[in-house]
């Protein structure tokens, strides 16, 4: 979702932690729109509609130029599973409190504050917020509709909002399986035009 417009579709996701992600994107009527492959070594987005592929390093700059969203590789992997950036080595605990049956934990960082809200019943992360040094929100993320999947609580709904960029991403899962072998690879069609970034 952006000020320019929003779009929706469906996807099949294969995620192999800690290093690879394959997303098959479908548009209206199930039309195969494209394929996104992320690994620690490579970023590849294949546009099925015009037979082009964008290839680059999986760094924040490449990802930002493609999706106009400032997220690093690990942040994207964690977002698909409803995890968010854990406290870093230099972060210090700012405060702990309980509000509306949620544990609110704040950490001070070099660049501002990280806020975690944890459900008091399930101990699952309900929301996460990054604030800059002036206290303005850089990123807000929420999870909901927790489901027990093979003994692990997983969110079926994830929403990430980038207030400064006026952009948001919403992920809603219909079906999930975990801890099963997956293959995160993709071969480009022979005649695809490849653009390197």
Describe each PLM feature range.
Residues 1-3:
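A short, Trp-centered hydrophobic/proline-enriched beta-strand micro-motif
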Residues 5, 16-19:
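Short, solvent-exposed loop/edge-beta patches enriched in aromatic
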Residues 6-12:
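Beta-strand-dominated lipid-handling architectures at cellular/organellar boundaries
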Residues 12-14, 33-35, 115-117, 145:
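Short, surface-exposed charged micro-motifs
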Residues 20-74:
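An acidic-aromatic
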Residues 58, 66-95:
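C-terminal low-complexity, charged extensions that often adopt amphipathic alpha-helices
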Residues 93-196:
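Gly/Pro-enriched, hydrophobic low-complexity segments
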């Amino acid at each position: 979702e952006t000020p320019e417009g929003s779009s929706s579709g469906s996807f099949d996701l294969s995620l192999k932690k800690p290093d690879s992600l394959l997303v098959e994107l479908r548009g209206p009527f199930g039309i195969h729109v494209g394929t996104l492959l992320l690994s620690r070594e490579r970023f590849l987005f294949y546009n099925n509609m015009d037979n082009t592929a964008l290839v680059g390093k999986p760094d924040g700059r490449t990802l930002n130029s493609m999706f106009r969203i400032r997220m690093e590789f690990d942040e994207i992997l964690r977002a698909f599973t409803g995890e968010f950036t854990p406290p870093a080595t230099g972060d210090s605990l700012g405060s702990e409190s309980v509000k509306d049956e949620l544990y609110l934990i704040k950490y001070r960082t070099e660049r501002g504050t990280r806020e975690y809200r944890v459900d008091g019943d399930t101990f699952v992360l309900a929301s996460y917020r990054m604030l800059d040094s002036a206290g303005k929100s850089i990123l807000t993320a929420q999870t909901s509709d927790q489901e027990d999947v093979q003994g692990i609580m997983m969110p079926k709904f994830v929403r990430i909002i980038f207030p400064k960029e006026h952009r948001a991403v919403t992920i809603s899962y219909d079906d999930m399986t975990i801890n099963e072998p997956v293959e995160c690879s993709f071969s480009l069609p022979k005649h695809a035009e490849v653009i390197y970034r």
